[in-house]
């Protein structure tokens, strides 16, 4: 039995006593205790692949701030790593793959990993975290979106131009669809396994969907997000596990995402919550959408922006604050001040009381 079920109630558009709040990258380098754990573990992957350390890092922000959810400490690139692409990290450059997939032979060799063998460390982390949370708040599991994972798998790492994957979209769209289909199968299996291990809410991060034109988004990202929402077994009634579809630059597609079958849509700061709520039309909850850079502001500026965000949602939702989960529009940066995060959380709690 959850002691704090605000997140789950809000994602299901049920009444809550105040707006729940959690933050993308709430467990991260801005926390000195995270940096100490990382130094001890030796690397990011050394933390992510050790269930006990992943649990420790997941719980760190909850020991500082009265957040309404924990999110599994992991990485979106665990699936392609388990497919054999071999994930590694370069300081200052981010994630890379030793074996990117760029031709038909490589793509057709890919299969869905076994979730309790190749990705057992993730499921073990979920189980350990659930035990340690002891019902205090829900645990969110997550995956990257098929399009976003395919970007990394083809480019071999992060990119500014996405030239390789866009070239494939234009020159060999059927091959790209084959890859996206395989990755979607893996994402569905991965999220289902996290749910079976104990995740109580799920989120898909479509980090790079916003680099696509509207026509390409509707061909190469949206159908696969919709497939996840419709095919992922999440239970029924009060036991149903809510799914959030988050994307950077997805404001133009809120109505499409609201029709996907997901319980909630996460948006960034490039669309107002009032506009997003009107587009959603009451079909889904909304999550977001404070610009993370707000945390560089003064405490008064942070409180002011929190108030504006809460009011914007209510404005687009017929005056009601129900069905809103407060979050940033993207993850926090390493140089942000933990004290300012505390100001944000306190402001959401005090300003959103019903």
From Swiss-Prot:
It is found in: Cytoplasm. It holds the Pfam family URO-D. The keyword Signal does not apply. One of its GO terms (biological process) is protoporphyrinogen IX biosynthetic process from glutamate. Substrate binds at residues 25-29, 75, 152, 207, 330. The keyword S-adenosyl-L-methionine does not apply. It catalyses: uroporphyrinogen III + 4 H(+) = coproporphyrinogen III + 4 CO2. Pathway: Porphyrin-containing compound metabolism; protoporphyrin-IX biosynthesis; coproporphyrinogen-III from 5-aminolevulinate: step 4/4. The record marks 75 as: Transition state stabilizer. One of its GO terms (molecular function) is uroporphyrinogen decarboxylase activity. Its EC number is 4.1.1.37. Keywords: Cytoplasm, Decarboxylase, Lyase, Porphyrin biosynthesis. InterPro entries: UROD/MetE-like_sf (IPR038071), Uroporphyrinogen_deCO2ase_HemE (IPR006361), Uroporphyrinogen_deCOase (IPR000257). GO terms for cellular component: cytosol. Gene3D superfamilies: 3.20.20.210. Its main location: cytoplasm. NCBIfam families: hemE (TIGR01464). Catalyzes the decarboxylation of four acetate groups of uroporphyrinogen-III to yield coproporphyrinogen-III. Belongs to the uroporphyrinogen decarboxylase family. Homodimer. This is Uroporphyrinogen decarboxylase. The gene is hemE.
């Amino acid at each position: 039995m959850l002691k704090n079920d605000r997140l789950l109630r809000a994602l299901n558009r049920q009444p809550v006593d105040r707006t729940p709040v959690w933050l993308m990258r709430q467990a991260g380098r801005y926390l000195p205790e995270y940096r100490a754990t990382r130094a001890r573990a030796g690397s990011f992957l050394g933390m992510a692949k050790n269930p006990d350390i992943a649990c420790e890092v997941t719980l760190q922000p909850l020991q500082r701030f009265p957040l309404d959810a924990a999110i599994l400490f992991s990485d979106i690139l665990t699936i392609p790593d388990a497919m054999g692409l071999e994930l590694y990290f370069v300081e200052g450059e981010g994630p890379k793959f030793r074996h990117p997939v760029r031709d038909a032979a490589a793509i057709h060799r890919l299969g869905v990993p076994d979730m309790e063998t190749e990705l057992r460390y993730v499921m073990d982390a979920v189980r350990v975290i659930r035990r340690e949370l002891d019902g205090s708040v829900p645990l969110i599991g997550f995956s990257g979106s098929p399009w976003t994972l395919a970007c990394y798998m083809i480019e071999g790492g992060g990119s500014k131009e996405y030239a390789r994957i866009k070239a494939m979209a234009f020159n060999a769209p059927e091959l790209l669809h084959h890859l996206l289909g395989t990755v979607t199968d893996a994402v569905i299996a991965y999220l289902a396994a996290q749910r079976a291990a104990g995740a109580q809410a799920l989120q898909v991060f479509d980090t790079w969907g916003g680099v696509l034109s509207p026509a390409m988004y509707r061909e190469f990202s949206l159908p696969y997000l919709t497939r996840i929402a419709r095919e992922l077994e999440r239970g029924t009634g009060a036991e149903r596990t809510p799914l959030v579809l988050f994307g950077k630059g997805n404001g133009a597609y809120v109505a499409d995402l609201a029709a996907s079958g997901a319980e909630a849509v996460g948006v960034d700061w490039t669309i107002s919550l009032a506009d997003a709520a009107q587009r959603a039309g009451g079909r889904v909850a909304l999550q977001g959408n404070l610009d993370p850079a707000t945390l560089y502001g003064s405490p008064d500026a942070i409180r002011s922006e929190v108030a504006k965000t809460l009011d914007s949602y209510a404005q687009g939702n017929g005056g009601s604050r129900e069905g809103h989960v407060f979050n940033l529009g993207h993850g926090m940066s390493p140089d942000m001040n933990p004290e300012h995060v505390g100001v944000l959380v306190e402001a959401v709690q005090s300003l959103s009381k019903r």
